[in-house]
Amino acid sequence: VEDTRQRALKTIGMLRDNGVQHVRTHIDVTDPSLTALEAMLRVKKEAAHLIDLQIVAFPQEGIESFPGGRELMTRAIEMGADVVGGIPHYENTRDKGVSSLVFLMDLAERHGCLVDVHCDETDDPQSRFLEVLA
């Protein structure tokens, strides 16, 4: 936690020195310990006077295809992440991709969060999750 915290604070200092006032950062919440999220939530509080830091709970390994993915996403939002993230084309099947979108939209609605979905970032023409999201 401390190493991540120190590196993030150093980066925020550099960003602020160059006029950056807002950052949206994606934190991988498929780490069951949620160590990076814990560190960045501390950084957000410590650096609030310097920069507006928005934290995305991002399921880098998927929500439905990763063991405990739904629980980790829910826990991340309950801990204080600002935005619900998603990456449906990383799920093992199309059905799981669709299910992950339904889950993340419901989670965001229940907690009043914004949504940040990395959608169809692939060369596969059959990856059409944007249609589901819309």
Model-flagged regions — what are they?
Residues 26-31, 59-62, 91, 121-122:
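Conserved short loop/turn motifs at secondary-structure junctions
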Residues 42, 52-58:
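A general secondary-structure boundary signal
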Residues 1-6, 56-68, 88-95:
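Active-site mouth loops of central-metabolism enzymes
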Residues 1-26, 34-46, 72-78:
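Alpha-helical scaffold segments that flank or form the walls of functional sites
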Residues 24, 54-56, 116:
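A structural signal for isolated positions on well-ordered beta-strands in alpha/beta enzyme cores
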